Amino acid sequence: MDEELQAIRQARLAQLQAEHGSAPSNIASGPSSNQQQQEVQDEMRQNLLSQILEHPARDRLRRIALVRKDRAEAVEELLLRMAKTGQISHKISEPELIELLEKISGEVSKRNETKIVINRRVQDDEDDWDL
């Protein structure tokens, strides 16, 4: 699967470079080339996600990105890392995506957990103002 995925990546990269009229080079020529590289990387990322996720799961991830971009990016990174290491053998369905989201949200809530401590005054039996 890695060889097939790599071939798809190379073909898509060649196609995008042909569209932009640029040859592959390691020399950056200003912010426009950085922007083009970012666009190419985003395109490759979206292609990989479309290969990993079923359509309903992809739609759910897009809706989540509208509300919580950080969570959506964390899930995308996790999915891409799992795909690169060969942990994904089939397309991820929507219920499986929900499980991943719950896992990530549980980790985030543990990190961001705040405790409120209320120190109540101890009732003092001895008054200084005995009149």
From Swiss-Prot:
Annotated InterPro entries: PDCD5-like (IPR002836), PDCD5-like_sf (IPR036883)
Pfam families: dsDNA_bind
A GO cellular component annotation in the UniProt record: nucleus
Entry superkingdom: Eukaryota
BP GO terms, sorted: chaperone-mediated protein folding
Residue ranges with Polar residues bias: 23-34
GO MF, one example: DNA binding
Region (Disordered): 15-43
Family the entry assigns: Belongs to the PDCD5 family.
Record-given protein name: Uncharacterized protein C23C4.09c
